[in-house]
């Protein structure tokens, strides 16, 4: 009797979309766009992950308005032209058997900053000399992210309403060019998460103060997007389950928020953490170890009854499989591991005994690799060493 197929390589159907396995390529900003437009770098970058066997390939956060970009190199989806530039890339991802997905976002008080490798802080004269432009970041309040960062302008109520529409329209554009999953970015200190966190939100109107008020704008965005996209299109939301800072957002808040998301029709909670940098130390309880955020996914899944996605230092197929088997999550996201090895999903399948004949690899690769493996076996070499 053959061994049961690893859960990591079982399909998952959500609404009208079936993912071929439970591996998700997490959205990671590349800071390589020009005026918000996707270019050849992005097309090749995302093609690797689809060929590498991931169930879902997320395109990095795309800003819903021009001034919502984190950096001058960030992707945008604030116009039809920006969305249309992604169409052929989306089609290729799908042609390789992966589900194309996109994260839509607004950088909030982290906007108008340097690219990560330039320092990840406020723009300098060197940036301006290189052609970068600056704009005023916005947030729930005028509280800057940290000492030395630009002071954001507090959004007016009318602007909050306009941004809700911008998220809605961005989601509609994404679906029109073929994206099959939409994720709203509500984590890592960006605009929507800064409304949730008491560390950033100091408003005294209907969008600040109580938990109910702080959730109002993010929930309005989720509702607008859910109403705008087809019923068969899954909607994910990425959250920071905790701030990791005393007096900040806690897991109990995330559980309550997720209950509201479930009522709206959100399908998956993508459980990350942190990002609201403030002057002072991060909570000493933060220990970055393999799977350190998976407990947040487990708790939200158990207490809310909603699907979750675990992310964060999930480096081995064995850990990914164990998290699924323990019912800690429904999907497993990898990021830097996929950058280091885009073929991690295919190799994980072989390692867990789910892809012995390379049947899930791109056909040309499968043919060559099968011959290679056969040759090694003929020489009497150990199967334990064939990948070396």
Feature map (PLM): residue ranges:
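Flavin-dependent oxidoreductase catalytic cores
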Residues: 1-388
């Amino acid at each position: 009797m053959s061994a049961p197929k690893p859960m990591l390589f079982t399909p998952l159907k959500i609404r009208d979309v079936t993912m071929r396995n439970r591996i998700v390529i997490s959205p990671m900003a590349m800071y390589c766009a020009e005026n918000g437009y996707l270019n050849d770098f992005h097309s090749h970058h995302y093609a690797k992950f689809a060929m590498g066997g991931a169930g879902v390939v997320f395109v990095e956060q795309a800003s819903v308005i021009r001034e919502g970009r984190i950096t001058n190199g960030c992707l945008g989806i604030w116009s039809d032209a920006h969305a249309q530039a992604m169409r052929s890339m989306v089609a290729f991802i799908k042609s390789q058997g992966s589900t194309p997905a996109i994260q839509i976002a607004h950088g909030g008080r982290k906007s108008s900053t340097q690219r990560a490798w330039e320092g990840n802080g406020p723009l300098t004269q060197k940036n301006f000399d290189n052609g970068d432009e600056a704009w005023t970041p916005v947030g729930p309040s005028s509280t800057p992210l940290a000492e030395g960062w630009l002071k954001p302008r507090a959004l007016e109520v009318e602007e909050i309403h306009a941004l809700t529409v911008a998220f809605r329209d961005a989601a509609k554009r994404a679906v029109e060019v073929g994206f099959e999953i939409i994720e709203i970015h509500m984590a890592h200190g960006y605009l929507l998460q800064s409304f949730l966190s008491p560390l950033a939100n100091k408003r005294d109107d209907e969008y600040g103060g109580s938990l109910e008020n702080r959730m109002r704008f993010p929930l309005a965005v989720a509702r607008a997007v859910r109403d705008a996209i087809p019923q068969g299109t899954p909607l994910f939301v990425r959250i920071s389950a905790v701030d990791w800072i005393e007096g900040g957002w806690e897991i109990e808040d995330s559980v309550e928020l997720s209950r509201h998301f479930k009522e709206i029709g959100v399908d998956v909670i993508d459980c990350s953490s942190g990002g609201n940098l403030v002057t002072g130390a991060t909570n000493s309880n933060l220990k970055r170890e393999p799977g350190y955020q998976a407990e947040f996914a487990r708790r939200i899944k158990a207490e809310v009854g909603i699907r979750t996605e675990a992310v964060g230092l999930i480096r081995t197929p064995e850990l990914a499989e164990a998290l699924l088997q323990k019912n800690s999550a429904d999907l497993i996201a990898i990021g830097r591991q996929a950058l280091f090895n885009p073929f991690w999903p295919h190799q994980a399948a072989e390692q867990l005994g789910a892809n012995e004949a390379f049947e899930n690899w791109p056909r040309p690769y499968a043919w060559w690799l099968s011959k290679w493996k056969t040759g090694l076996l003929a020489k009497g070499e150990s199967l334990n060493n064939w990948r070396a």
